[in-house]
Design a protein with these regions (language model features):
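Post-signal peptide N-terminal regions of Sec-secreted extracellular proteins
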Residues: 37-79, 142-152, 156-161, 183-184, ...
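Aromatic-lined carbohydrate-recognition surfaces of secreted/lumenal glycan-active proteins
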Residues: 247, 335-356
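Distinct, well-ordered alpha-helical segments
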Residues: 354-365
Length: 430
């Protein structure tokens, strides 16, 4: 046999088979050994990689987010098929026709943040593969900004009537431009003010937010809101309605230390007496007033004290229904006995307002004598949420704090607590 001639025939045959396979769009995977002699019988067993045409199989979807709040970003995602795909996201701003690549946006998804993009920006992705390039459809990013007309928005959205709008303030907003506030709330609007707070334990040092001076709570766990008087005067002088609230605080039932080192033996009734004293001494509340008088029922911070050489930490909890009733009944008794009205309220979150125990609403007894100022923020984007708040045993809310992200131009501050009120919110509960 002529071995040289046989080797040539074998080489020609191998090359012919390889050419045939290649013409079908298949290429053999890398050989385990570049020097191994070709084996005809092994060709059919070699793994093959097919080049797939680049194609978008799922388009990115448009999204709506808020400039502020809990939903301030959106993730655009694309699905594609093909071989060795590469991604490049692009944007197009409103009013332009140019697509511009986004630096480092080279994955299947792109996260767009409200702080980085203007409302109406469009996004697409260009996908490149071994067999072509595909462009996705454009997805639009809608960015919602806080509203300046929450009362009108709520009436249109929920079919309500007589709704007014307001802002609630405390010493944390000391120095705020009140003309800007009173202009924003409108002629029939309102301002809710913190009268005082029991949030700090006794003998606790803190910095006065109005004067920036170091001070202490002393022997009682309460502090008068240092901005209350000035803000109340400005609101009254502008002809806007007022509301007044007391932040629940340290009282004897929540202090587990033997010497009452946190609460100092203070009671809800004593808190109510102090609230009324500061309310009447301010001068803006008269016998003709029907202002909401609110007990703010919320938990507070954890505080640490050294007692007899040992460290003790307690967290300020929200008051219970019996504690709230003790405060509210004392306020009512003291005011009505002096010829004043008592338009009693409680403030709390919607989940707390609707909490239940053994099949009964926790706040049923409180709801019998008060109206409800409820906090329900949705995504907290400075706009009226898409759903009305839960109210538990109250038939409805009287005042609704819908956000802490209201933006009022000219105030010199950022986000503010904003509210809307029903038409009868300044009418005492019968």
């Amino acid at each position: 046999m002529n071995h040289a001639r046989s080797a040539v025939r074998l080489a020609v045959a191998t090359a012919s088979i390889a050419l045939a396979v290649s013409s079908l769009g298949w290429v053999p995977a890398a050989s385990a050994s570049a020097t191994a002699a070709p084996q005809i019988g092994a060709i059919g067993a070699l793994p093959m990689v097919k080049k797939v045409k680049t194609k978008i199989t799922k388009q990115p979807k448009s999204a709506t987010i808020g400039r502020y709040g809990t939903r301030t970003s959106a993730t655009f995602t694309v699905k594609a098929k093909g071989t060795k795909l590469r991604y490049r996201w692009q944007y197009q701003l409103t009013g332009t026709t140019t697509w511009t690549s986004i630096a480092r946006a080279t994955k299947k998804s792109y996260k767009a943040k409200a702080a980085d993009w203007s409302a109406g920006a469009k996004f697409r992705v260009v996908v490149k593969g071994k067999k072509g390039t595909a462009k996705s459809k454009a997805a639009t990013l809608t960015v919602l900004y806080p509203t300046n007309t929450p009362a009108a928005d709520a009436m249109a959205q929920f079919g309500l009537t007589g709704i007014t709008q307001g802002i609630d303030l405390s010493a944390w907003q000391y120095g705020i431009s009140m003309p800007s506030i009173t202009s924003w709330v409108g002629g029939d609007g309102f301002v809710m003010l913190r009268n005082g707070s029991g949030s700090r334990p006794i003998n606790t040092s803190f910095v006065n937010p109005c004067t920036k001076a170091n001070t202490t709570t002393g022997s009682t766990p309460i502090t008068k809101d240092c901005a209350y008087a000035g803000l109340a005067d400005a609101t009254t002088n502008a002809g806007r309605r007022l509301g007044h609230y007391w932040f629940n605080g340290w009282i004897a039932p929540m202090d587990s230390t033997p010497a009452q080192s946190f609460a100092g033996g203070y009671t809800p009734e004593q808190s109510a007496t102090q609230f009324v004293t500061w309310l009447l001494s301010d001068g803006n509340y008269t016998t003709a007033s029907t202002d909401p008088l609110v007990l703010d029922i919320e938990s507070g911070s954890a505080w640490t004290k050294t007692i007899d050489g040992k460290t003790k930490t307690l967290k300020l909890r929200a008051w219970t229904s019996p504690e709230a009733l003790a405060f509210l009944n004392t306020v009512r008794q003291q005011l009505t006995s002096q010829g004043y009205h008592a338009n009693l309220y409680v403030y709390m979150g919607a989940n707390n307002a609707s909490s239940m125990s053994n099949g009964t609403y926790v706040w049923t007894d409180v709801a019998a004598i008060t109206r409800l100022w409820v906090a329900s923020w949705g995504t907290d984007n400075g706009r009226i949420p898409t759903a009305l708040p839960k109210t538990g045993p109250w038939p409805t809310w009287s005042i609704w704090q819908y956000t802490d992200n209201a933006r009022v131009a000219g105030t010199g501050v950022g986000g503010l607590d904003a509210d809307i009120a029903q038409a009868d919110a300044w009418t005492p509960k019968s």
